Structure formats: structure tokens, C-alpha cells
């Protein structure tokens, strides 16, 4: 098990029935415990697996699934029917379950013992039809779940379970997430608006607005010794421009950036996991927060520019899902295109706020003018994103529901150096092509603010959408405009109906 999530756990619940007798049930318990321990030992799984005693009655099932729902440590449940477990016994428990569930369809052994198999073996190893009975009742009750079929010794199986666990972790983080919104939405912008009451009802996230001068007070309460220490950290970590170093003519700008970072950290320490800013509402701040935002994102905080709390929530959620994985996750915005026929690419960036977790090299720390915000020149980290497979994820409020849009991409090196671009950036090739990708994104109403991740897989995002009951449109190598339009029409009907199921 990875060491990053030490407080969270997944419960492993095995179903059977008393009909088999105590000897068989003892074997079921022994083998299911061994299977759970094998999962717990897998490096593919980011969360501890905790075996629970075999359940054989409706009351026992209800008790364990109620306990899972109320446990602050439990972020999800894996279920497995080692033998046949009559599924009517599961109705009350499944109806009470409020945590993500994975139905694992497996068996204890790998091979059939052809030479020795007898009815005792057949009586014990009945997952082939026990899980079918369980699958029926889940579908009959419209239980949202992920289903994984495979032996636990197969790395494909553990990888798939690990992916679901990460989705469950993201959903758990979102259920308790608090976002500090400094100022309001950028004036007249549509897609960054949204229903915060519905967001808290649907996802659990709490979004509240604070005056930017509440932040400014925290910023200007920072002491000089704190700033000195952080400036030294900058010089030890990044390629700091000479003009920003101690004795340089712009060193005061670096100190101001450090002051803003420390003030932000002090403010957010009061239980916040994400935040937003707005260049139209900077109050007494002397710089638009740039370096501070980048470093806070690198530490796992969610961020959205121009009051975009939905993207801020998704940055935090995806970062949680990606903890311990190679790659990174950042706030992002599509900026401009290279439309060279046959090699079309998208250049993504923002005014300042791109997370260095996606950097392909040591970032340089620089100061440059910024034409908006009417403040002093802000300091920022400058770099280009490392190449690799990734996903660009957006969230929008469709009025009747939230919609996630995910485009599978390949992050690539820029075609040439970018000596005059004073901000961090990423260049990517979208699937299946630039034209189909952008047509689909526009048809979906996808936002211009997004999350770029090279850590979290599309499969994990799909599991997250299932867990949270959120629409997800994936744009990948199989997408065509015609089929994508059809999917959106079907989804519109489904989600209107599902809201009442």
C-alpha cells in the first residue's frame, strides 16, 4: 500500500449465507481474509483494505454498510460473493449505503483443479453465480458502482481497483472541501458562474466569499523573518532571475510575492482546501497573486481564476486522486492554436497561475509586467509542461445538472523556444484531432478554464463521475461529432429521469 493515505481505508465485505454450515463459512472467512490481505499488500492500491467478517443475514449486511456510511475513515466498500448470497438480503443494506462501492467479481483460486474437483469444491467456490445474483439486485436498485472482474493476483485487476480507490478518495475530499473565494466572479463571464447551493447538495463542497481585504490583512501581518526564510527557499529551489535576488533591483518584488504567499497560507490554514482570486478585485494587494498560487497548487490546493470556484474544486479533487502518481495537475486555460495542417496543437497557459507539478524542467522565477489588474509587476514561475499522456477536464453548470467534459490529450514539447512568453505554459495535441476535439468541446458547452492532469487516468475520472452521479462526456480517439451529439441528447434525457429515480 502507498504511504500517502494513512487515515483512510476501504472495507472488504464478503457475502454468503448460513445454509452452508459453519465449516464452509469458516473457509469462506479464511479465504476472503487472505484475499483482502493480498489486496492490502498491493502497491497499486493507495488505501488500506480492511477485511470485515463475512455477512450472512440481512441484519448483518445492514449493520456493516451503515457502519461504513458513518465511518469517517471508510471512503468506500469492496463487495464479493464468495458463495451464493441470496440478494434480497442485501436490499436494506444497499439502500442505506452512502459510500462508493466496487463489486469485485473474482474467486480465491486461479485454476480449476481438474483432477481433484468435487462437490465440496463446487459448494465453496460459487462466485461465478453468487456475483451474478448480487449484480442483479444492484442493477434492480439502480445502485451506482464500479464492477471489476479478475483475479487479485492479476496486476490488471489491482490497477483497476486502485484507479477506483483514487476516484473514491477524490469524492471523499470533495464532500468535505471548503473553498475560500476572494471577491466575486469576473464581471459578465457566464461559464464561471454556477449554483453553489446545488454544488453543496450534489458534491458536498462548501463555497463562501471573503473580502480580498480580509486576505490583504493576513498578507500584511506577515513578519520580515518569515519573508527572509521563504525567499531563501525560493533561491534554493528555482532558477531565480538575477534582478530578483538579494541585492537585485527588483528584489522587493520577490519579497512582496513571498509576503502574499505567506498571507494566503495563513488564511487557508483555517480549514480551506481550495481558493479563487479575481484580477478585477485586488483590494489592498500590491500584486496579483501568481507565484503564491503556483506554489499552493504544487502543495495540493485547488485554484480557480476570476472567481471560478467550480474549477478550483476540480483542481483540488484531481490532485487528491493523483497523490503519489507520476505527473502533475494544474489549473489551465486554452489560449491559442497552432493550426499547421496535420500537426494542430493547443497552447494552454494563464496570466500567471500554472502549477509547477507539470513542469518539465526546473522553473525560473521571474518578474514581468501584467497589463491587467492595475497593480505592480507580479512575480511568477516560468516553465513548459513535461511531455506525456494527459487529460483536460472541465466542469460546467447546465442548469439541471453539472457536466464534466474530458479530452484525452498528449502533452508535447513546443515546436520552438518561447523566449518572449513570460508565463508558464503547456502544449498538447488533443484526441482524436484538433477539429473533432474542439467541435465536441464547443457542442458540450465545455469551459475555457480547465484542469490539465498527466497523473490521473480517464478511467479514474469515469469512476469519479459514477460515484458522484455526474454527467461525464469523454472526447477520445473514438469520438465523432455525430455520435457525440447523439450522446449528449441521450444524456439530457437520462439525467432528467435519473434525478427522480
From Swiss-Prot:
EC code: 5.3.1.4
The entry's keywords: Arabinose catabolism, Carbohydrate metabolism, Isomerase, Manganese, Metal-binding
Cofactor: Mn(2+)
GO molecular-function terms, A-Z: L-arabinose isomerase activity; manganese ion binding
Reactions listed under catalytic activity: beta-L-arabinopyranose = L-ribulose
GO biological process, one term: L-arabinose catabolic process to xylulose 5-phosphate
Enzyme class at the top of the EC tree: isomerase
Binding, Mn(2+): 306, 333, 350, 449
Pfam families on file: AraA_central (PF24856), AraA_N (PF02610), Arabinose_Iso_C (PF11762)
Recorded superkingdom: Bacteria
GO cellular component terms, semicolon-separated: cytosol
Biological pathway: Carbohydrate degradation; L-arabinose degradation via L-ribulose; D-xylulose 5-phosphate from L-arabinose (bacterial route): step 1/3
Cofactor note: Binds 1 Mn(2+) ion per subunit.
Alphabetical list of InterPro entries matching this protein: Ara_Isoase_C (IPR024664), AraA_central (IPR055390), AraA_N (IPR055389), AraA_N_sf (IPR038583), Fuc/Ara_isomerase_C (IPR004216), Fucose_isomerase_N/cen_sf (IPR009015), Lara_isomerase (IPR003762)
Function description: Catalyzes the conversion of L-arabinose to L-ribulose.
Protein family per UniProt: Belongs to the arabinose isomerase family.
NCBIfam families per UniProt: PRK02929.1
Protein name in the entry: L-arabinose isomerase
The species this protein was found in: Mycolicibacterium smegmatis (strain ATCC 700084 / mc(2)155) (Mycobacterium smegmatis)
Gene that this polypeptide is encoded by: araA
Amino acid at each position: 500500500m502507498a504511504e500517502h493515505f494513512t487515515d483512510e481505508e476501504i472495507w472488504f465485505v464478503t457475502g454468503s449465507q448460513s445454509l452452508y454450515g459453519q465449516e464452509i463459512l469458516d473457509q469462506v472467512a479464511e479465504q476472503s481474509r487472505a484475499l483482502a490481505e493480498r489486496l492490502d499488500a498491493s502497491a497499486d492500491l493507495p488505501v488500506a483494505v480492511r477485511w470485515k467478517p463475512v455477512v450472512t443475514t440481512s441484519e448483518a449486511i445492514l449493520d456493516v454498510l451503515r457502519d461504513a456510511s458513518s465511518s469517517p475513515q471508510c471512503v468506500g466498500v469492496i463487495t464479493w460473493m464468495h458463495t451464493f448470497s441470496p440478494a434480497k438480503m442485501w436490499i436494506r443494506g444497499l439502500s442505506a449505503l452512502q459510500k462508493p462501492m466496487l463489486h469485485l467479481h473474482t474467486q480465491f483460486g486461479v485454476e480449476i483443479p481438474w483432477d481433484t474437483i468435487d462437490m465440496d469444491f463446487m459448494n465453496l467456490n460459487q462466485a461465478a453465480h453468487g456475483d451474478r445474483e448480487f449484480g442483479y439486485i444492484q442493477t434492480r436498485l439502480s445502485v451506482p458502482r464500479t464492477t471489476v472482474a479478475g483475479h487479485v493476483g492479476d496486476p490488471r485487476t489491482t490497477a483497476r481497483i486502485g484507479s477506483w480507490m483514487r476516484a473514491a478518495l477524490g469524492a471523499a475530499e470533495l464532500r468535505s472541501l471548503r473553498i475560500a473565494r476572494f471577491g466575486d466572479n469576473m464581471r459578465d463571464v457566464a461559464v464561471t458562474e454556477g449554483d453553489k447551493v446545488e454544488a453543496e447538495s450534489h458534491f458536498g463542497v462548501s463555497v463562501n466569499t471573503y473580502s480580498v481585504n480580509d486576505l490583504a490583512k493576513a498578507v500584511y501581518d506577515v513578519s520580515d523573518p518569515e519573508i527572509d526564510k521563504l525567499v531563501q527557499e525560493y533561491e534554493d529551489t528555482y532558477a531565480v532571475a538575477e534582478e530578483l535576488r538579494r541585492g537585485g533591483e527588483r528584489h522587493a518584488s520577490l519579497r512582496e510575492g513571498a509576503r502574499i504567499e505567506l498571507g494566503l497560507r495563513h488564511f487557508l490554514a483555517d480549514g480551506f482546501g481550495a481558493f479563487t482570486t479575481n484580477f478585477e478585485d485586488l483590494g489592498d494587494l500590491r500584486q496579483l497573486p501568481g507565484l503564491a498560487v503556483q506554489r499552493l497548487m504544487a502543495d495540493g490546493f485547488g485554484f480557480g481564476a476570476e472567481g471560478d470556484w467550480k474549477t478550483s474544486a476540480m483542481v483540488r479533487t484531481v490532485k487528491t486522486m493523483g497523490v503519489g502518481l507520476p505527473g502533475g495537475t494544474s489549473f489551465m486555460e486554452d489560449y491559442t492554436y497552432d493550426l499547421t495542417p496535420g500537426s494542430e496543437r493547443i497552447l494552454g497557459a494563464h496570466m500567471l497561475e500554472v502549477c509547477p507539478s507539470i513542469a518539465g524542467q526546473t522553473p525560473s522565477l521571474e518578474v514581468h509586467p501584467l497589463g491587467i489588474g492595475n497593480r505592480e509587476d507580479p512575480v511568477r514561475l516560468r516553465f513548459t509542461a513535461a511531455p506525456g499522456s494527459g487529460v483536460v477536464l472541465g466542469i460546467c453548470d447546465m442548469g439541471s445538472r453539472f457536466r464534466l467534459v474530458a479530452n484525452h490529450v498528449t502533452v508535447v514539447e513546443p515546436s520552438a523556444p518561447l523566449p518572449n512568453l513570460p508565463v508558464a505554459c503547456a502544449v498538447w495535441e488533443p484526441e482524436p484531432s484538433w477539429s473533432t476535439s474542439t467541435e465536441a468541446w464547443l457542442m458540450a458547452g465545455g469551459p475555457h478554464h480547465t484542469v490539465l492532469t498527466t497523473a490521473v487516468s480517464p478511467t479514474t475520472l469515469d469512476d469519479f463521475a459514477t460515484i458522484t452521479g455526474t454527467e461525464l462526456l469523454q472526447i477520445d480517439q473514438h469520438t465523432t461529432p455525430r455520435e457525440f451529439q447523439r450522446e449528449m441528447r441521450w444524456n439530457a434525457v437520462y439525467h432528467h429521469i435519473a434525478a427522480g429515480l
